[in-house]
């Protein structure tokens, strides 16, 4: 008796993997064994970079705050220290947004910290 391979499930599985590889170049997008490796690696990078993104954005916010602080005659570290001493609880994301979108308001914040 011939072996039943369950073609429906096999085809669905292949289709699912190939769908994840849409847009991949060359054999990475159409040869199943290569596609499996490419998709696995892509998912590893995606997992890692979801975490790296948080670090990258925090770093960007700090750079923006530091640049704006230096325009106002202080530095990032002095400003954060003053915020801690005065119990000002504005997070870095919001501070960076204020620094970019409304420099006048940022200047007011800096002056209030060093009074």
Curated annotation (Swiss-Prot):
Please list the GO biological process terms of this entry: ribosomal large subunit assembly; translation
MF terms per GO, please? rRNA binding; structural constituent of ribosome
InterPro entries, alphabetically? Ribosomal_bL20, RIBOSOMAL_L20_CS, Ribosomal_protein_bL20_C
Acetylation is among the record's keywords: no
For this record, an example GO cellular component is:
ribosome
**Keywords, A to Z?**
Ribonucleoprotein, Ribosomal protein, RNA-binding, rRNA-binding
A Pfam family annotated for this UniProt entry: Ribosomal_L20
Give the protein's biological function: Binds directly to 23S ribosomal RNA and is necessary for the in vitro assembly process of the 50S ribosomal subunit. It is not involved in the protein synthesizing functions of that subunit.
Family named by the database record:
Belongs to the bacterial ribosomal protein bL20 family.
The protein, known as: Large ribosomal subunit protein bL20
